[in-house]
């Protein structure tokens, strides 16, 4: 069983699965979410696409890496789920940046705004992650560099185009 944790396009995952199958090998696309902290703590979310029997065999190992390991469907489904996750990450990251820019321009301390948002309906994981980075302007030490998100949003943009979907917020976030 080959397990791939890359975030790539769905076609790449399916091509890898087909090539592996020709060699008699199972391939699971199993992208992860949760960052370095999730990896260190064994709390990653792992979204898996592929054969159910192969998933059941690999689960013993995947379960040591992640607290939330789910078979999403056939080959490509794990990758698709990761892209869906990244769609929300991208949009929420842009929304948080704009919210904190507005707070700053209104004379509101970023940390105070973040403290209130964490107990309000406007809360999001990305807002909570972005607040200290924005407050200190320490963008170099972000756990997930913008270039990774930019790559993922580009894949999402291409997928939406290929599927004939109009994902306006995704397109605006990518810009």
Which residues does each predicted region cover?
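Rossmann-fold dinucleotide-binding core
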Residues: 4-86
